[in-house]
Structures are given as structure tokens and as C-alpha cells.
């Protein structure tokens, strides 16, 4: 099947964005990541107007939904390029754009360093030997599965790169540490930062609940983190 691939391109934050279109003739079972790799393998790469263009900048590390690096807007919805297959998308035109909530680096690459900085500011590490209860093994495991891809932050109306609100990714990752930490002073520090950087800033729109590309039980983890950090349960 022949697909039209529309890509929003931009050389840097200071330059203007523009659209380029390419043709992909291949299997409907191909992933968007496979499409991008195939386009960049062309020498030279030409757009649909016949112009020779530079290779498309995008990120990937695993191609199997394990790293989160290939998160982007696919037909206006945040997804992972490696796990989004053409047959799951409507029509034969595929639109690719960078995530909009993070500073642009180039083309489909964004700088998600503020996501990781927010986790540091929440003090999400252990100061004591981890307490591991069999009763909370499953939610702790789910918390640890987070790819930190940023898809949940992309759809959050309360998150932006220049705000202190850390977003769902912080609450999801916080549960594991809140549940395992035994050192009370550090636990209180985490709880205080959690209230300031997540709980007090969440508008309860719940737009993050169904967007996770690996299907994390986001609502359950938010409830558990809130209970541990805010009410000490």
C-alpha cells in the first residue's frame, strides 16, 4: 500500500518549521519507526516534489517499546513510533510532528531533560534499604515499567516545560519510592515535594489515563501515590 508521510520539520528552535511530504510503498504492518528508517536509508532522500532533502532527525534506541525515545505526535496523538503500525491508523496519510510540550532540538527530536530534572527535584531515590512487601509487588512493578516517554505530559493541560508541575510521570514513578523508603526524614521530604510539584498542581482532567503507550494502570498508581504522600497511607 502507498502512504503519504507528512513530516513537520525544523532545523532548530530559532528557525521556522515547514512541512515535507514523502511516499512510502510498503506493508500496512510496518511501524512508523520502520517507515522513518526506510526513508532515511534512501540515498539521496527526496521529497514528493523531487527535492533532495536532509535525513529526518528522530530518536530510537530499541525499536521494541522499551526505551520511550521515539515518542512523537502521530496523526496528532502522542504515541511511540516503534509500536504504532500503519494498519492501526486511519487513511493513507500519516502526519508526524514533534511533541509540543518540550523544547525542540531538530525535526522530531525534543529535549525531555526537564522531565528528568523534575524527578530529581522530587528526591526520588532511596536513602535506606528498600522495604518490599509482597502486597504491593504488582503496583511497584508497574511503576518501574514507566518509559518516561512524555506522552502523558503531552496531553496534560497543566504541564508545560516552564512550570514547576511535574505531571503524571512523577506521580507514577513516586509510588515505588514512597512505598519502599524506610528513612522517615527522606520520606517526609519526598512527600512535601510531591505535594508541591504534583498534587497541588493536578487539575484532575484525567487526560493522562488512557494515553500511556504501554498501558500502565495510571489511575491506580496516582491514587496510591496520593494516598502515600498526602495522607500517609
Each predicted region: which residue ranges?
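Well-ordered beta-strand positions in beta-sheet-rich domains
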Residues: 18-23, 81-83, 157
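Ferredoxin-type iron-sulfur electron-transfer modules in oxidoreductases and energy-metabolism complexes
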Residues: 30-51, 92-233
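A basic, amphipathic helix-loop patch mediating RNA/tRNA/ribosome contacts
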Residues: 40-75
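Residues in well-ordered beta-strands of folded domains
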Residues: 6-8, 25, 83, 97-99
Amino acid at each position: 500500500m502507498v502512504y503519504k508521510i507528512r513530516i513537520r520539520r525544523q532545523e532548530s528552535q530559532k528557525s521556522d518549521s515547514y512541512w515535507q511530504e514523502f511516499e512510502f510503498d510498503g506493508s500496512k504492518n510496518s511501524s512508523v519507526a520502520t517507515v522513518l528508517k526506510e526513508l532515511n536509508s534512501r540515498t539521496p532522500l527526496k521529497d514528493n516534489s523531487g527535492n533532495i532533502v536532509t535525513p529526518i532527525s528522530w530518536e530510537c534506541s530499541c525499536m521494541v517499546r522499551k526505551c520511550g525515545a521515539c515518542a512523537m505526535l502521530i496523526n496528532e496523538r502522542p504515541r511511540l513510533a516503534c509500536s504504532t503500525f500503519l494498519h492501526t491508523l486511519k487513511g493513507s496519510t500519516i502526519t508526524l510532528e514533534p511533541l509540543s510540550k518540550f523544547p525542540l532540538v531538530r525535526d522530531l527530536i525534543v529535549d525531555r531533560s526537564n522531565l528528568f530534572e523534575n524527578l530529581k527535584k522530587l528526591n526520588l531515590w532511596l536513602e535506606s534499604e528498600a522495604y518490599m512487601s509482597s502486597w504491593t509487588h504488582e503496583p511497584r512493578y508497574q511503576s518501574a515499567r514507566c518509559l518516561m516517554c512524555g506522552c502523558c505530559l503531552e496531553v496534560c493541560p497543566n504541564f508545560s516545560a516552564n512550570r514547576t508541575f511535574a505531571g503524571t510521570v512523577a506521580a507514577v514513578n513516586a509510588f515505588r519510592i514512597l512505598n519502599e523508603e524506610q528513612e522517615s526524614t527522606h520520606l517526609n521530604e519526598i512527600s512535601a515535594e510531591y505535594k508541591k510539584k504534583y498534587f497541588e498542581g493536578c487539575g484532575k482532567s484525567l487526560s493522562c489515563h488512557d494515553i500511556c503507550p504501554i498501558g500502565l494502570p495510571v489511575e491506580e498508581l496516582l491514587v496510591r501515590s496520593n494516598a502515600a504522600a498526602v495522607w500517609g497511607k
